[in-house]
């Protein structure tokens, strides 16, 4: 007997394998999106530090103002904040993103803002 085509078992096995491969690919894509949101928040916080340094060079102090009379600074679409707090010897700032529940922070000076623990290095949780 000469058969053409595939048996039901063969088709079922191929479908299961394809389902596994697709589920792995979707999970990796979701992780990549989360990492992208965190990277944009960290980049925005580094840019904030740069803007604060430029501002303090002219005015000899840091500021919480963004825009007219304050920092020349723009936030990436999707990022929220920054919330800037002046400290005795610098400032601390935090930022969120509308697509994730994680937040990132950075500080300059001696007053850390968790999750940041190293001065000038943004950290997220």
Language model features with spans:
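Conserved catalytic core of two-component sensor histidine kinases
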Residues: 15, 42, 49
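Aliphatic-rich helix starts adjacent to a transmembrane/signal segment
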Residues: 28-45
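N-terminal single-pass transmembrane signal-anchor helix
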Residues: 1-29
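Periplasmic/extracellular, small/polar-rich flexible segments of pilin-like filament-forming proteins
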Residues: 50-125
């Amino acid at each position: 007997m000469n058969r053409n085509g595939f048996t039901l078992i063969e088709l079922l096995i191929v479908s299961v394998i394809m389902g596994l491969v697709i589920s792995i690919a979707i999970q990796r894509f979701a992780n990549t999106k989360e990492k992208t949101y965190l990277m944009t928040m960290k980049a925005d916080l580094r840019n904030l530090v740069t803007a604060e340094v430029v501002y303090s060079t002219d005015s000899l102090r840091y500021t919480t103002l963004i825009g007219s009379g304050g920092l020349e600074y723009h936030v990436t679409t999707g990022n929220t904040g920054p919330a800037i707090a002046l400290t005795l010897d610098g400032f601390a700032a935090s930022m969120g993103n509308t697509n994730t529940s994680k937040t990132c922070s950075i500080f300059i000076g001696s007053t850390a803002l968790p999750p940041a623990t190293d001065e000038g290095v943004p950290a997220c949780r």
